[in-house]
Amino acid sequence: MVLDLLKSGVLLAVLASFTFSVMNALVKEASATLPAAEIVFFRSAIGTLLIYLLMRQAGVALSRQGVPMLLVRGVMGALYLVCYFYAIAHIPLADASILAHMSPFFVILFSALFLGERIPRAVYWLLLVVVLGALMIVKPFSYSSYSVYAVVGLLSAVFAAGASVAIRQLSARHHTYEIVFYFLAVATLVAIPLMWNDFVVPATLREWGLLLAIGVVSLLGQVFLTRAFSHESATIVAVTRYIGIVFNAGWGWLFWSEVPDALTIAGGVLIVVACIALSRTKKG
């Protein structure tokens, strides 16, 4: 019965969202004493080792073709992690999660710019709704440190979209494990100069435990997500993943007493509704 459940794309997408939300909570806890770039380094280094072992077990070899695009995907993914973890450390989990979930719209824009894909007219109206929702969350006219951190969270969606467009170019010729390996290996290297001046040696078993858990849990979430896409359409998986916002809000409320304000809730609703409508537009 468990095996049958694990063949449900929707359930796997929910599990992936839940697992990534756990990772986000662990990142927020670790960021109390460790810099975001350092967390990215350990998360990526541990993940690189684990995915390499999976590649060995599955007999997947590193190819010599398409390396430049693999590196682009890796850099985009690395910058996504740095921005997202930095945002998680400074703003509520729900806010960071909502902003990161804006990536589908940037995927549409990048696909039009770099892949020559046509943007349906309806998407322009949905984009306006998303921009309005983002402004309600970022609050650019409040001139507070929160707004700066929220902009960094928004940048995480931009870099995530860049990574997604690169994956679309790579997935036809490269195994998923290889794409993930390059992402994690490059992220490990990118994190080194970013953490160089602020590196803090983890001093307690608790800090080491958090870093190890982040690496393992994030890879587990990646496996769930990959399996979800193999058992269900990309549209259904993408829509289902918005439940991750609820999970993140739950952890934020439970452990850090984070309660989103009215503007954030309203902006989040606009973004989620617009993104679901976008998925239906793409499906149509």
Swiss-Prot record:
Q: Does the keyword Lipid biosynthesis apply?
A: no
Ranges where the EamA domain occurs? 8-138, 151-279
Q: Enumerate the subcellular locations listed in this protein's record, separating them with semicolons.
A: Cell inner membrane
Q: Which InterPro entries match?
A: EamA_dom
Spell out where the chain crosses the membrane.
2-22, 34-54, 74-94, 96-116, 122-142, 147-167, 179-199, 209-229, 236-256, 259-279
Assigned GO CC terms: membrane; plasma membrane
Q: Where does this protein chiefly localize?
A: membrane
Membrane topology designation = Multi-pass membrane protein
| Keywords for this protein | Cell inner membrane, Cell membrane, Membrane, Repeat, Transmembrane, Transmembrane helix, Transport
Summary of the knockout phenotype:
The deletion mutant is susceptible to treatment with AMS and shows decreased intracellular iron content after incubation with AMS. In vivo virulence of the mutant is attenuated.
Expression triggers:
Is part of the operon cntOLMI that is negatively regulated by zinc level through the Zur repressor, which leads to transcriptional activation of this operon under zinc depletion. Highly induced in response to airway mucus secretions (AMS) treatment.
Q: What does this protein do?
A: Transports the metallophore pseudopaline, which is involved in the acquisition of nickel and zinc, and thus enables bacterial growth inside the host, where metal access is limited. Is probably involved in the export of pseudopaline. Essential for iron acquisition during the interaction with airway mucus secretions (AMS).
- Hey, which family's this protein in? Belongs to the EamA transporter family.
- What is the protein name for this chain? Pseudopaline exporter CntI
Query: Native species of this protein?
Result: Pseudomonas aeruginosa (strain ATCC 15692 / DSM 22644 / CIP 104116 / JCM 14847 / LMG 12228 / 1C / PRS 101 / PAO1)
Q: What's the name of its gene?
A: cntI
